[in-house]
Amino acid sequence: MRKLGPVTIDPRRHDAVLFDTTLDATQELVRQLQEVGVGTGVFGSGLDVPIVAAGRLAVRPGRCVVVSAHSAGVTAARESGFALIIGVDRTGCRDALRRDGADTVVTDLSEVSVRTGDRRMSQLPDALQALGLADGLVARQPAVFFDFDGTLSDIVEDPDAAWLAPGALEALQKLAARCPIAVLSGRDLADVTQRVGLPGIWYAGSHGFELTAPDGTHHQNDAAAAAIPVLKQAAAELRQQLGPFPGVVVEHKRFGVAVHYRNAARDRVGEVAAAVRTAEQRHALRVTTGREVIELRPDVDWDKGKTLLWVLDHLPHSGSAPLVPIYLGDDITDEDAFDVVGPHGVPIVVRHTDDGDRATAALFALDSPARVAEFTDRLARQLREAPLRAT
């Protein structure tokens, strides 16, 4: 979706920002970016296009922002699949910048803010070793939320080959007997439900656009459901357009179209991303990114964070103190859940290197889905033993 007004550069999603050389008053913004570890560079006209500038910084376009006052710079960035394109309207060219592919248009760089306060994944304490974490969770009843791919399951080359990590099902069964649990996935609801295979828990598919409660009650976001026919059309167009690209998989889901490029040639990824972002603009959808995937979904203000809060509100709870939400996830879309959990719960990121040592809103970390299974098993055991310790 194209929009106007203030925009935020997020070090969780962006590794660098490229400015065209005609822009002035960039010094303060550059200083803010450098303080949070986001690189900066410039590009000019002619052959010095944004993709060349990104190469100089050794950053992927999919994790890079372009800021340009000219249609040529915006167009070049869109054709190369950059993550965020900010147009700067200095001469009344707002509409042209939007047509050429700007994600947002500002009139002054003071409208661009920089997110602060996050830490790099490598800087976080291990959730299994953090002193007092487990005891604090046992003292108050937790509600535990899991992502699937990269959290309960290892990331694999073929998404259809992803299943629970060894020991995860048994650990989930033990934990579900002690506290509410939910699996929130970007996969279709039926898909993630089958892959986990544990009855009597919450499942959310398509980043929360569709859910089932432990009793089987089905819920869906009706505003998002209106986009289902459009997503079907976009999926067909992308399959035709990207079919000749070896290693690219277009996955049509009920509430989304995921384009996986993990097995594609690196020099074709920009074209893949550009095709998806063009479809976003053509069909008035929204783009999200993840680990070697770019996805179209309904342009509705809903995400895993809002889903988590909705589920919390629907959980039965007899105690006087509120439930403590724990969220475990690995991907960019999980950051929305970390944001809402952080003030009063426990956000845990599962480390990986697909996006380098990126920033995260999580407060703790685990190193792999195997460690997630271990953490889950340990928490279940401590919850089981808590009444014994109290007597």
Swiss-Prot record:
This is Trehalose-phosphate phosphatase. The active site is at D147. Removes the phosphate from trehalose 6-phosphate to produce free trehalose. It holds the Pfam family Trehalose_PPase. Its cofactor is Mn(2+); Mg(2+). GO terms for molecular function: magnesium ion binding; trehalose-phosphatase activity. It is an enzyme of class 3 (hydrolase). Belongs to the trehalose phosphatase family. InterPro entries: HAD-like_sf, HAD-SF_hydro_IIB, HAD_sf, OTSB-like, Trehalose_PPase. Was identified as a high-confidence drug target. Inhibited by EDTA and calcium. Diumycin and moenomycin stimulate activity at concentrations of up to 100 ug/ml, and then inhibit at higher concentrations.
